[in-house]
């Protein structure tokens, strides 16, 4: 938006989200934590304390960073020119571990300027037992403590995120390529010979 605005273009119609795929984080980190707990019983208590909490902790910290950005002078300059706030989108919100609440990625992350994509089973669970109150800014200190524990037990979250990013891109590239191939085929079929 900075570049568009600097070039004199209207930025008031731009809408966007920054997506966070939540359950993938916990699935990957939890597997690593399980392996570490087996290998190093001395850190078992610390490992158990963070299991199933990394995705939400990371999202809550991201929200704090998001607020800093949207409250900055740089962003406020764009708002004065009509910019809409980019919202945080929570995706992959169905829990993969049956030991966890089926609405944990919803209940804990409700807040201003956020969007949550819900699969049908999570929608049904929310209709039944969600706590619809703004909690994105609760227990932020605990979120930092969860993330700070990871290197202590032997997990580099940056490396985990890089792996998840690569896996996620791959998961989107293959279907996109397949879609493009089918469109090319359809165009050829519909084109006069």
State where each predicted segment sits.
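Structural preference for beta-strand elements that scaffold enzyme active sites
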Residues: 13-19, 87-89
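Glycine-rich phosphate/ribose-binding loops and adjacent secondary-structure elements
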Residues: 20-25
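Flexible, acidic glycine-rich loops studded with aromatic residues
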Residues: 82-188
